[in-house]
């Protein structure tokens, strides 16, 4: 039975990875986050939730102790300082982003290597400036903001570390600052702007969590060790490209929200951070999944699993 440690289990990504893994037979799951009391789940399976703060653990001693207690075979790193919390003019936010996004992945990789563990690390489309679109694994990183630069620096090249690049949307248990939660929080009868000049081909947190499950179990013929040796980062692009206007319209349709999405094309420059793929091993069928279908699967899982606890 593989033992898996999910770091950052109360964030948008970590919460979904935890919920999916706790329902997977044959996995021994340990969770970790800054405030374990915030973890809640409708899953009847008992789980250990450890306390861990990547920002405060500058010397790595807390991480070493956590791995010694948990003895994981795989670590899914869902810890990160996201864009809203590391604005360029925010000195404290910049410092946190450097510690957590850029430096922590190296401490994690080294600590995991000492114990024979493998690490799955999410990489972001925000390492690109969004001018050209269709960015492949070989496209140079050219973002100039704190988030993009720190996430770029945190992509670790090592045999026990697999960087998976994608952009994610999903529900949140706590902070509710994501695009989906923001939209769902709009009152019926309201109007929101939908940017038709912003293009995106990300994934749901459920899709990413299930990919992680395949990487741990070797599902769909995915061999972690072989994949980690294929390059610094692999792009995961199973879904079609949509505009943010179309995406918000799908939110309304799938979640039954009576919210009007106003089409906007003239506010700010066009943004296209869509990803291209040179090595389609993670999604060999290419971008064949309709975004509506991916969102319906996400909504169904959220309801059936009792995601919000």
Sequence positions of predicted segments:
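Catalytic helix-loop patch of NAD(P)-dependent Rossmann-fold dehydrogenases
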Residues: 91-99, 103-106, 126-164, 168-174
């Amino acid at each position: 039975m593989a033992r898996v440690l999910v770091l950052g289990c109360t964030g948008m990504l970590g919460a979904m990875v935890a919920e999916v893994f706790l329902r997977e037979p044959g996995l021994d799951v340990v969770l970790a986050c800054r405030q374990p009391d915030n973890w809640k789940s409708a899953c009847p399976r008992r789980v250990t939730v450890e306390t861990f703060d990547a920002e405060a653990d500058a010397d790595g001693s807390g991480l070493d102790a956590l791995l010694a207690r948990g003895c994981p075979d795989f670590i899914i790193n869902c810890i990160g300082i996201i864009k809203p919390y590391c604005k360029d003019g925010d000195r404290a936010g910049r410092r946190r982003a450097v510690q957590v996004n850029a430096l922590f992945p190296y401490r994690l990789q080294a600590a995991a290597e000492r114990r024979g563990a493998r690490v799955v690390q999410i990489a972001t489309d925000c390492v690109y400036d969004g001018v050209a679109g269709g960015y492949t694994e070989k496209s140079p990183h050219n973002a100039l903001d704190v988030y993009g630069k720190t996430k770029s620096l945190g992509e670790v090249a090592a045999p026990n570390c697999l960087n998976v690049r994608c952009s994610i949307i999903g529900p949140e248990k706590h902070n509710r600052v994501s695009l989906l939660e923001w939209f769902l929080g709009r009152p019926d009868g309201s109007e929101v702007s939908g940017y038709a000049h912003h293009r995106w081909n990300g994934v749901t947190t459920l899709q990413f969590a299930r990919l992680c499950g395949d990487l741990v179990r070797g599902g769909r013929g995915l061999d972690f060790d072989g994949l980690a040796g294929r390059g610094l980062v692999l792009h995961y692009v199973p879904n079609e490209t949509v505009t943010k206007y179309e995406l918000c319209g799908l939110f309304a349709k799938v979640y039954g929200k009576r919210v009007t999405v106003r089409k906007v094309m003239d506010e700010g420059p066009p943004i296209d951070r869509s990803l291209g793929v040179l090595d389609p091993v993670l999604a060999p069928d290419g971008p064949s999944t309709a975004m509506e279908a991916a969102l319906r699967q996400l909504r169904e899982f959220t309801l059936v699993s009792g995601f919000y606890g």
